[in-house]
Amino acid sequence: MELLWYIIAALGAGIGTGAVLTLLGGFMLLLYFWPQISRFPLAMQTLQCFGRLIVYIVPCVMALLPIRFLTGVPSFVFRKMLHVVAFTCFVVMMLAAGGWQAAALTSVIIAVLVYPLLSLFENESWYGKLFVQKSPGEVKRSLLMVFFMFAAVIAVSWGVFHDPNAAAAAILMWGVGDAAAALVGIPFGKHKVNFRPVNGKKSWEGSLAMFTAAALVGIVILCLCSGSFTGTSILCVLLMALAGTTAELLSPSEWDTVTVPVTMLAVALVLL
């Protein structure tokens, strides 16, 4: 137990040091250029988005550290817990943003900041213990793709089609559906999907779980939150879930974080 607490303390120190140095550097730049920055509404809205992300992410990370090192939670479960924090925090940030430009810009800036930060620490011993990687460098590549995907989905759905609910639905349906596929498919997936080009590692049980979870989330977002509980909305949600599940089956492992939400969003924008 003492060793576990030592590991957590070391992790907290490493992560905390990097985070504090990054925040201090950003804060000093912010103070220096504040007279210029405060003149631009987009800059102020983007700073508000950053603030919401920090308020959301920090408590989540503090809660996940002891779960990772003080419990016997399987690695694939913890990986999905990290994913849940990532996609929910950006949806919350987006829906509370003053405009799509600020939300999309925040996603891009986070990608630019996180990638070199993870590259700096990826050779540390605690990095491999905290993050669950399928291959070397997979976490930072995945996060880079996810953040740019968030920016693109927000820009297209909200910026072009003026529909932030569709972006929220696509991101949440993908995130929850992907988690359900892993949580059901890995321990209970007995019947593998063997037709080409599926790689044979995915199961019908996991795909069914993804479809069901994605459909339920889509109904809540598109139908209840938008006040449009109609047959057309239900059909749209089911087709989004089906298209996303199919995209997940056919996509290479690391690319499903992009192909699935983009496919779901495309279906929503065409049908709604």
Regions flagged by a language model, labelled:
Residues M1-F27, L31-I54, V61-L105, V114-L224, ...:
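Interhelical loop and helix-boundary elements at the membrane-water interface
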